[in-house]
Amino acid sequence: MAERGQQPPPAKRLCCRPGGGGGGGGSSGGGGGAGGGYSSACRPGPRAGGAAAAAACGGGAALGLLPPGKTQSPESLLDIAARRVAEKWPFQRVEERFERIPEPVQRRIVYWSFPRSEREICMYSSFNTGGGAAGGPGDDSGGGGGAGGGGGGGSSSSPAATSAAATSAAAAAAAAAAAAAAAAGAGAPSVGAAGAADGGDETRLPFRRGIALLESGCVDNVLQVGFHLSGTVTEPAIQSEPETVCNVAISFDRCKITSVTCSCGNKDIFYCAHVVALSLYRIRKPDQVKLHLPISETLFQMNRDQLQKFVQYLITVHHTEVLPTAQKLADEILSQNSEINQVHGAPDPTAGASIDDENCWHLDEEQVQEQVKLFLSQGGYHGSGKQLNLLFAKVREMLKMRDSNGARMLTLITEQFMADPRLSLWRQQGTAMTDKYRQLWDELGALWMCIVLNPHCKLEQKASWLKQLKKWNSVDVCPWEDGNHGSELPNLTNALPQGANANQDSSNRPHRTVFTRAIEACDLHWQDSHLQHIISSDLYTNYCYHDDTENSLFDSRGWPLWHEHVPTACARVDALRSHGYPREALRLAIAIVNTLRRQQQKQLEMFRTQKKELPHKNITSITNLEGWVGHPLDPVGTLFSSLMEACRIDDENLSGFSDFTENMGQCKSLEYQHLPAHKFLEEGESYLTLAVEVALIGLGQQRIMPDGLYTQEKVCRNEEQLISKLQEIELDDTLVKIFRKQAVFLLEAGPYSGLGEIIHRESVPMHTFAKYLFTSLLPHDAELAYKIALRAMRLLVLESTAPSGDLTRPHHIASVVPNRYPRWFTLSHIESQQCELASTMLTAAKGDVRRLETVLESIQKNIHSSSHIFKLAQDAFKIATLMDSLPDITLLKVSLELGLQVMRMTLSTLNWRRREMVRWLVTCATEVGVYALDSIMQTWFTLFTPTEATSIVATTVMSNSTIVRLHLDCHQQEKLASSARTLALQCAMKDPQNCALSALTLCEKDHIAFETAYQIVLDAATTGMSYTQLFTIARYMEHRGYPMRAYKLATLAMTHLNLSYNQDTHPAINDVLWACALSHSLGKNELAAIIPLVVKSVKCATVLSDILRRCTLTTPGMVGLHGRRNSGKLMSLDKAPLRQLLDATIGAYINTTHSRLTHISPRHYSEFIEFLSKARETFLMAHDGHIQFTQFIDNLKQIYKGKKKLMMLVRERFG
């Protein structure tokens, strides 16, 4: 026997924490075919190892494992005992328990100690095995591996029968494993060098590649020495790389692989393909593996000469590698005082586990940490979020297999998350983490909740987790539960009746982190006898129990209830599911749903009895301080998923899981009667109806909108996800009854319902949920559907006058959120959902006048966003004017009414879509008819600005396209034209600056109206109108053939104009030139009247000189529009009015010259000389202009003699 002592680190890998390892905790019935329990999703069959067990009992022929007519001997007692020992006991305990162990017994224990299920190999070599829906691992350790009941030393079974069974089962397992790898690989890329699959190529997954290597015959030299398996795996040559041979070594203990080594240098979380290939070779072909006892046993049988020869040959074969170590050990052994001589015996890496060794599967902690750190450093890019979610899924898979590495792996992940440098950076900058990153933290917290609620967790293990969680929780950068700031809600994760801490001072509460709920859950236990009865039996009832109090343990039918804070109770369900107890989770879920339904009925009764007193005193009570939808523990989603899974898993599959009470002790039956499980459901009900009903209960719950952007987005997201799942279910008559029942409750349950008559001002709106209810109920009960949808339309948080506190603030809610000002970060999304609900109702109500009127009234009352009402108006218009049917005039009127409301809402506010809205309204009114167009023009002042009314509304109404579209007769045209002219004049009176021109245009065909509009312009010209507007109207008048009116307006415009000396590019210059040209064309008198205005308003020399030259080129009145003629002589510059203009022009040049010289730079000298040249031309137009210009130049030379270079240029040019 191997001698054990204090072993040096290289001999043993002590890396596992204590925990409920799952590899050996299941059925003892199977040891059968290699992979006989391995399904296409890497899951065990109905009973792991069942095929092999049946074969061992003579049923092999029926199962196809043996040829017809062949039978197999029963499994030997030696193999049965050896298999159980190999699963449960470390080999050291066997050695210590028995003084001598016969060699055949040792061989069978060593034989059965290797894992026999491929499921674990698959789990540790790929991200996702597809086994998430499978149950616990209790059936894995005995199934899927090993060869029936024999094969290999010491067996008394028939070799031929054993070989046949193993070969057939191996073939089946190979096909199943290939299918499982394909299912697992699709869309689930691995990480690291071993299996990065960006495109979802399953052939690159380590497990799939390992199968391929095995099937290709690439595994050789397989040798099992004790609890150590070794072999070589040949990697075939590919185009870029030559063939390589990898040396693989595997240590195992109690049906778990405890360490792996491969020369391929793989750096990954999971086992490489070579380890997979060698492991599957041992599982599928155990009779082809050379089996030896631990090396210490072999050495024990050698005498001194043999031992010396053995050591010398070993050193000779590997002298370059082991000689230094051999010499060092020899020196230590020969030294009497060396440490090695103080220890009895010597280590043996092939001798199996010691008593103190932890029994868990090999997990490379360093690689887990490195990979998580890498994913976090990528900051959400390159699919890192998806990879981390896959790691979380792997943790859940391990938990379901009851593998202690689940908690161990999550600890490693959490440590890396806590070490993320971005946490402190975000905290310092006061910025929120990204939404995807925040969701990863949520999943982290939820997984810890599952782990600490493990129903079979040891107290010392839970204490260790609690210590670690508190350590993380105390770190400053630990993320808060709500994503933004600490929750103001009290500690609700407890097993006590809720509301006990409702009045706790929120200011004194510490912030709740993502670990707070897991820390609180450490105080929960599973020892409650009522709870154990619920989860351990389908037959737990009490018909003698008639206590109808709120917290009674049974309802009136004798069915068990579970009164606990709902999210906490649902966390128990999630924990049971996560740890592989689906039957127990289902039992508790049913009890919780029945409790919720009973509470719901009592709430309805209570509200009905108190309804009359409600307006007078505050008597309502909200029993849920936290909403269940969007809750960190996702209670509704957990119940829904558990019940929906039960719809897909039949009783036979559920019965395959180990008995939950195996480690908890049997419960006493006492006086309880027994009832079949299906009696816990009403007649006609099923798990599906329960799932749907609990989803409706959760979605319809009245709940306060939480604080913070993230939590509010989470509420919306979770609601939409749950509704999306509901939409996948096809409604039948049974489900419709559930919908009706819940819809009635929602309408009548008052403050307990989010659709009750009275709700809190800050309650989460029901728009999304109501839209789903509406569409679901509409074909079956339209009246109820509309009641639900219309009730849900309200959005009280936007109401300017909130209802009184007595009606809307039940005392529990008021104590938690006292008068805080709501910050609804998701308000835009909520309003969009409100709009979607309204649009759905409008579409459904097409053709129903009464319902359309009701929906319209609701929209006008409850929707406060003009853009959303405009969208609804457009939607209604599109529905009403579909191409394949006649227009729906009622829906068109609804569309028009909504459009009118939009106009009123946006009339006094800025809206960038306003012009689009006005144009659309006119189009809509046109579709409705001529009376609608006339109506909007009659009431234009409540709908439009004067500018919109004249430039868009009236203009469009008067257009030819409108007349043609409506097929108007002369009388109708005149009526519309009269309304348009009236509108135009009213707008011109109210806003002449912007509407005068439009008014004149609209009134052209009516002389009286046109004169009225012109008079309005004249009256406004002296007060509010600008020269630009007056010039525009003046040009219009000239164009229409009214030159004198144009002249009048031009003179009025000139009085408002002021052009300084340097504004030689002013946009009004063309208007001034046009006005002067108009005056010149009308005659000398008109020109004489306008020139003083020009001189007064224009100081720019170039503009004045331009006007002067134009006036001297032609005779005034020669091109007069009225045909009158003046004398053919040109006007003299020495006489008025041109003399005044000439003097003003010369003066402007003088002033401009001095202004320019004040700030002139050398680069502008040449430009200045050209300017003086133009000035000289103007000077010379006067009879003494030469003298004036000479004096002007001399004066410049004297004043600016300091500018020598400039003056030199002046002298050169002008003397």
Curated annotation (Swiss-Prot):
The keyword Iron-sulfur does not apply. Residues 18-38, 133-155 have a biased composition (Gly residues). GO terms for cellular component: Cul2-RING ubiquitin ligase complex. A zinc finger (SWIM-type) spans 246-283. Keywords: Disease variant, Dwarfism, Intellectual disability, Metal-binding, Neurogenesis, Zinc, Zinc-finger. InterPro entries: Znf_SWIM, ZSWIM4-8_C. One of its GO terms (biological process) is striatal medium spiny neuron differentiation. GO terms for molecular function: zinc ion binding. The keyword Metal-binding applies. involved in nervous system development, important for striatal morphology and motor regulation. It is linked to Acromelic frontonasal dysostosis: A rare variant form of frontonasal dysplasia, an array of abnormalities affecting the eyes, forehead and nose and linked to midfacial dysraphia. The clinical picture is highly variable. Major findings include true ocular hypertelorism, broadening of the nasal root, median facial cleft affecting the nose and/or upper lip and palate, unilateral or bilateral clefting of the alae nasi, lack of formation of the nasal tip, anterior cranium bifidum occultum, a V-shaped or widow's peak frontal hairline. Neurodevelopmental disorder with movement abnormalities, abnormal gait, and autistic features: An autosomal dominant neurodevelopmental disorder characterized by infantile-onset global developmental delay, severe to profound intellectual disability, mildly delayed walking with broad-based and unsteady gait, and absence of meaningful language. Patients have features of autism, with repetitive behaviors and poor communication, but usually are socially reactive and have a happy demeanor. More variable neurologic features include mild seizures, spasticity, and peripheral neuropathy. This is Zinc finger SWIM domain-containing protein 6. It comes from Homo sapiens.
